[in-house]
Amino acid sequence: MGLELKNVTKKFKTIEGERVIFENLNIHFPDYGLIAITGESGCGKSTLLQLIAGLDQDYEGKILFNQVKIEDIKDYRQLVISFVYQNYQLIDYLSVKDNCLFYCHLKGIKVVEKQLQELLEIFELNELVNQKVKNLSGGQKQRVALIRALLCSSPIILCDEPTGALDEINRQKVYRFFKKASQRRLILIVSHDQKISKYTPYHLNFEC
């Protein structure tokens, strides 16, 4: 059950010819847990998340969720996946709260106000809840994106450099919270920060 990659190969066409990002990749992820994905830039870490999210379907092999190909699962991205992007993907003219509510509304999820308040306090954004996102710093926007993903209770959360704009204190706080949250879901984090390894027994390292 859970998420599984079977003989997955991803290639890109370049001016020089065809470039293989990874070939015959086989991974059977646990149903829950925090998994760090590290490695040099350009080795396929973010590409792997794009494939798992169903955003890139140009690959060979199979990606399965609960033994069903993700392409065959109705509303897979809506019901199964929450994605935290490097560039946040927030709506600037909406408030912190409305960004969270709108994202969950798109996924058909009713937000529990108490849960939202708890997350706002954990990530120290409770005093900015009605601020428009365009007025926030990069680190604050990153925390809003994290809250939004966690609110939706998706079984899989994909994070592409989710702590890049955070200072060291908030970075460690996010890692600790993700470790706790991963007791109920699978969280995959692409990161250049090797310190994440101490928060998880699972570690995938990509080499070019």
Locate the predicted segments by residue.
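ABC ATPase NBD coupling module
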Residues: 69-82, 181
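Helix-to-loop junction immediately C-terminal to a conserved catalytic motif
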Residues: 53
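Catalytic Walker B motif of ABC-type/P-loop ATPase nucleotide-binding domains
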Residues: 157-160
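Conserved ABC ATPase signature
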Residues: 132-136, 140
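Conserved ABC ATPase "signature" region
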Residues: 113-128
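Conserved ABC transporter NBD signature motif
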Residues: 61-71
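A short, flexible loop at the N-terminus of ABC-type nucleotide-binding domains that lies
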Residues: 1-5, 10-24
